[in-house]
Amino acid sequence: MTKKKGIDIIGVPSTFGQRKLGVDLGPTAIRYAGLIPRLKQLDLDVNDKGDIKVSAVDIEKFQSEQNGLRNYDEIIDVTQKLNKEVSASIENNRFPLVLGGDHSIAIGSVSAISKHYNNLGVIWYDAHGDLNIPEESPSGNIHGMPLRILTGEGPKELLELNSNVIKPENIVLIGMRDLDKGERQFIKDHNIKTFTMSDIDKLGIKEVIENTIEYLKSRNVDGVHLSLDVDALDPLETPGTGTRVLGGLTYRESHFALELLHQSQSVTSMDLVEVNPLIDHNNHTAEQSVSLVGTFFGETLL
């Protein structure tokens, strides 16, 4: 963080961006794993604002085949509500820590944050680019589209909530190992700074994070949002997430990455998404997530 701020925790129990029930329980699982006391032990001012109100899941509709964008009205509703909550936190000079929920919630959080910065940078720590558009998405799952929407392309109603779009050149993708054809082309066309798992293997996570920080500084960003999807981590270690891709970042690599980001004091807001306790092992992924967040906010062994 650029300076020590109080933290507002905002839960978003939304599962509407994808097809697996359980990710809506992510905020509860993360809290149950000890997030609040973990942060308070660091002598941080922590305010848990609870969860935003999300529509109940209509199981029959949720499990059915839907034409076009899945659960679109529900996602608009979640986006609007989250946008207001996050914006209020920033106006009160607080650090918004948003707990998902699936990654479609980033449409609401980042669109709110970008209104308060002139040149926001985004670190997308994820196995996927989330850069699809409806025309190129066979699934219609909006959790595969948030970053593209935030750059100004996508469904009209969601774009209207995003008045200050993210510049593609202000984005850094870390952990990529599953990209659709259209996403690969978009990354190439816009020269988005990208670190695939192959790059991380070659460079090491230390150099990747240091390069990320320096790159965003060179872009003269005035804030940095970290969007951390737990599927960036390898599912053999971090199983409780819905879109698993083998060969991901290790738990230790991720700890080190977040330690370096803490030391940089550059990140001004954060999402933590895609924790699904229904497909986890004894809440292991939520516990890992709490430990990672602790490291990000300055927790050390000694």
Swiss-Prot record:
Catalytic activity: L-arginine + H2O = urea + L-ornithine
Obligatory cofactor(s): Mn(2+)
GO biological process: arginine catabolic process to ornithine; urea cycle
Molecular function terms, GO-annotated: arginase activity; manganese ion binding
PROSITE patterns, A to Z: ARGINASE_1 (PS01053), ARGINASE_2 (PS51409)
Keyword Transport part of the UniProt annotation: no
List of residues binding Mn(2+) 2: D126, H128, D229, D231
Example of a GO cellular component annotation carried by this entry: cytoplasm
Family (UniProt): Belongs to the arginase family.
Name listed for the protein in its UniProt record: Arginase
Originating organism: Staphylococcus aureus (strain MRSA252)
